[in-house]
């Protein structure tokens, strides 16, 4: 028992020391983290959908799934709301992510997760694929109204491989150039479609090479921004669905 307690105390000490070694981001960096991890909440049947979600309890596999009869009773727009605010599958990340310094000065290789330790089920991603045109239209409608693209919308766009939304996203990005994760969406779309000029670039090797990880990034500056926009526009012009 004493050995167990000593081991636990040592682990706790190591954890505290590791926390002390974490960087201490600026307020601007922390504010940007809040901005980039914000989920867009659609208004369609929102109160009804939230009430349904509030009654869910995880099953033995930690899945919080709306029963099929209730899910099928929802309209398309209500299903859109449900899927955009609720991930059904539990996927715990055991490794805590340390704070990121100067997060607002980076273009990341990957998007942050929309639902913490949960993610979309196959049923939910299938909804996006089966109703692709409607989902894209609803995302555009919501973004036009709110003037922002939530991380859940970005994840859905990448999941659907929605290349056709590139011009719209670029227009949104150029309004204030604040949301650098829109540039990440462009990178992920080019990667998913194996766009050779991008795959052959040094930035691709840096972002998605053998040494890449969840936090891999390139510096946000005018040169990198313009290069991504130029490449994604060339990709879009030559894309054949």
PLM region spans:
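Alpha-solenoid HEAT/Armadillo-like helical repeat scaffolds in large eukaryotic proteins
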Residues: 138-142, 156, 168-176
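Core of folded catalytic or high-affinity ligand/protein-binding domains
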Residues: 148-159, 163-165
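Extended repeat-based scaffolds of very large eukaryotic assembly and lipid-transport proteins
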Residues: 19-152, 191-241
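Hydrophobic core positions within HEAT/HEAT-like alpha-solenoid repeats
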Residues: 154, 186-187
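Short amphipathic alpha-helical surface patches that serve as generic macromolecular interface elements
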Residues: 166, 183-186
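Bacterial Sec-dependent N-terminal signal peptides
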Residues: 1-28
